[in-house]
Amino acid sequence: MTVKYSINELLVDHESLSDNFTCPICFDLYYSSSSKKEVFQCRDGHLACKSCWSDSLLNKKECMICRTPVNSMNELSRNRFIENEFLKKKVYCPNSFFFIENVNVDDSSMNEALIRDESNGCKEIITVEALEKHQVECQFRFEKCPFTGCDKILRLKQIAEHKIDCKFSSKYCLHCDKEIPGQLDAHALVCPKVRIQCTQSESCKKSFPREQLRLHIDQDCKFTIVKCKYCCLNNSKNESIDFKRFELADHYEKVNHSFEMDKVINNQQLELVECKNQIYQINNKYEKLLERVIKLEQLSMDASNKLSLLPRFKNSIIFATFSTHKLKRVNEGISTVPLDVGNNKFKLTLYPNGYDESNKGNISAYLYRVSINEPAVKVSFTFVFNNQDSRKNRTYRIQEYTFNGGATSGWGYPKTLKTVDVDSANGWLTDEDKLVIGLRIQVLP
């Protein structure tokens, strides 16, 4: 649990801040609520945060202050001196304030929400650079009570004392060998391992774990009421068919059940015949289903063999000096040479700044058929935008699309990566300024 704050509220000496530490465009400090911002400058030394530069260069290729031409982020230099100087500023520990729930960091009332806790708060004054590490180690940070059901939020130093008296604290049950939240007395009334006496009759003196009670009553307890399995078939003699389990053996010995037993045997024989018929029918159904499965497996194998014989293309496409292409206008694309896939030719076309105005600022990727006077062809195709960190690769797949014969036709994704994000810092470009896209094309039957 952390105190919500803006870095401006933690500063010990606001007067020591100069305009050099504030972005002249968005007027925010060069530091977010949890990490420093990157500061970039034009060749004439005018500063702004990275996000402001990125947004501005999408509209105008110039410095926002002096109008010096700036074609891309690669033409800016990073001002680490300003970044590091801000990290040396002194701040109060966030845990010097009271914890207040449901406070938004961006709320305009934030200054009113943060209140110093002079009695119990942290007294440390640290640098901005040490802030994150200190918060992890601070003994005055806020923690939620670990016991289920307790919603109290306390300082770490107060948790140990609170746990002693917390009504939701866990207790160890010797019977079930578990930590139990709440009171042990209440748990003992339902604990499956607590030994209890049989509840079927006071005459039964046996005891066992609670979880075995139902099994004992159903199968073992001699005082459980049971029925004679024969008398229920013919009760014309008005004999009682309910007995305590220990009386049943005596009943079977004294009463002749031969007639009833014959009925049971006859019924079982009829049931046996019915079961045999059902087994025969099930076996027939099984044989038919097995035949269908074999046929389907053969069809699947034939389809796979046919698909493997169909034309396909798989290779990596490299777009060199891609940073220069990011300056292209909307609907201005760059294409590969024609790629042979069987009797068809295709080309991959990228629109670095969008195919049209609706996807401006995004890279649009389309596959075009350039074969002339060829019949329609159905394909599946995949674009894989490769990142230096392969875990971040982006895959875009079209399961099925039919390219019509004759006229040039194309299909793809109007929005893939954001244009501004495609640089070497984010891993989308190599050190040689190359964008690498894996392309797979499969002709379908």
From Swiss-Prot:
ZnF RING-type: positions: 23-67
Keyword Zinc among record annotations: yes
Keyword Methyltransferase: no
Zinc finger (TRAF-type) boundaries: 133-186, 186-242
GO biological process, one term: lysosomal membrane organization
Coiled coil regions in record: 269-307
Entry keyword set: Coiled coil, Cytoplasm, Metal-binding, Repeat, Zinc, Zinc-finger
Alphabetized GO MF terms: ubiquitin protein ligase activity; zinc ion binding
Localization of this protein: Cytoplasm
Pfam families named in the record: MATH_2 (PF22486), zf-TRAF (PF02176)
Main location: cytoplasm
Cellular compartments per GO CC: cytoplasm; endolysosome; pathogen-containing vacuole
SUPFAM superfamilies (alphabetical): RING/U-box, TRAF domain-like
Description of its domains: The MATH/TRAF domain binds to receptor cytoplasmic domains.
Function description: Probable adapter protein and signal transducer that links members of the tumor necrosis factor receptor family to different signaling pathways by association with the receptor cytoplasmic domain and kinases.
Family: Belongs to the TNF receptor-associated factor family. A subfamily.
Protein name, entry field: TNF receptor-associated factor family protein DDB_G0290971
Organism whose genome encodes this protein: Dictyostelium discoideum
